[in-house]
Amino acid sequence: MLDDRAKLLLKALVERYIADGQPVGSRTLSKASGLELSPATIRNVMSDLEDLGLIVSPHTSAGRIPTARGYRLFVDTMLTVRQEQFAAHVLAPDQPQKVISNAANLLSSLSQFVGVVIAPRRSSVFRHIEFLRLSERRLLVIIVSPEGDVQNRVIFTETDYSQAQLIEAANYLNSHYVGLAIEQVRERLKNEVESLRSEIASLMQAAVAVSSEAMSETQDEVVISGERNLLAVTDFSNDMGHLRRAFDLFEQKAQLMRLLDIAGQAEGVRIFIGGESQVVPFEDLSIVSAPYEVDGQVVGTLGVIGPTRMAYDRMIQIVDITSKLVSNALSYHK
């Protein structure tokens, strides 16, 4: 348990190191903390903090820098998020993929690190369906999901349907089955098939099959923006190993997907410092993330990836604001 003096010194050390990236010595810490303590007293406190694994002394300097554990204590107990006024940013309502791409770019631009967004999870529920006759026994099925995604599929049928029959079938599906999962629609059709004209029942069963196929093909997608920003970060540009691990993460995406999925299970902004997530075991990377919603339902996650030496107060606000912008844009478009 740290006393108030040790907490103040740790807070001052972390803030100073985030600001200039240089190991912090006792003289600098004395000025930064505003405490009237002798250099010897400060050195003793720093030694205690080092014993607790909160700071460490690089081999090339007499100063100290925070460890991942030190950053975690700082974020959990000492961080004050100031209401910084960003320039007015708006994500216009649009197709989901466009909103997601714009959000990743916005995160990258505001943070000057890497912006990541998991695209909305496609629902197995349809909002609207239409049929268009292309030629004899050849139809276009248009499926609209609750998230606004549009899937088009061409199907071949045994019967040559007229456009009037196609409209009748679509109207029946849209009036009776909207909001139900595809599997629920399939089961209900089995029970209702006797009350429907056989040719219409066959068409709707084919439509349900192709809808299920279309929706099962869609998978979560990670949109990444600003990877090159890390080239300008001293923490990475001075160590090619750090940079290589980061770019491997962006290229493979599987680890990143798992981490953002975990983050999306919590409310509000979540911070992973260094390797504490155990999914992305890189001590030199931190991720600030938050879920976003459509009509109150979480459909994806977004965040900022950067060095552990980042301005967490600013990143929290950037991520929080962007998640709200994405939620509003997707809900409005819907």
UniProtKB/Swiss-Prot annotation:
Keywords: Repressor, Stress response, Transcription, Transcription regulation
GO MF annotations, alphabetized: DNA binding
Biological process annotations from GO: negative regulation of DNA-templated transcription
Signal peptide: none
Entries under SUPFAM superfamilies matching the protein: GAF domain-like, Winged helix' DNA-binding domain
InterPro entries: GAF-like_dom_sf, HrcA, HrcA_C, WH-like_DNA-bd_sf, WH_DNA-bd_sf, WHTH_HrcA_DNA-bd, WHTH_transcript_rep_HrcA_IDD
Pfam families documented for this protein: HrcA, HrcA_DNA-bdg
Function statement: Negative regulator of class I heat shock genes (grpE-dnaK-dnaJ and groELS operons). Prevents heat-shock induction of these operons.
HAMAP family: HrcA
Protein family: Belongs to the HrcA family.
NCBIfam families: hrcA (TIGR00331)
Name this polypeptide is given: Heat-inducible transcription repressor HrcA
The species this protein was found in: Albidiferax ferrireducens (strain ATCC BAA-621 / DSM 15236 / T118)
Gene that specifies this protein: hrcA
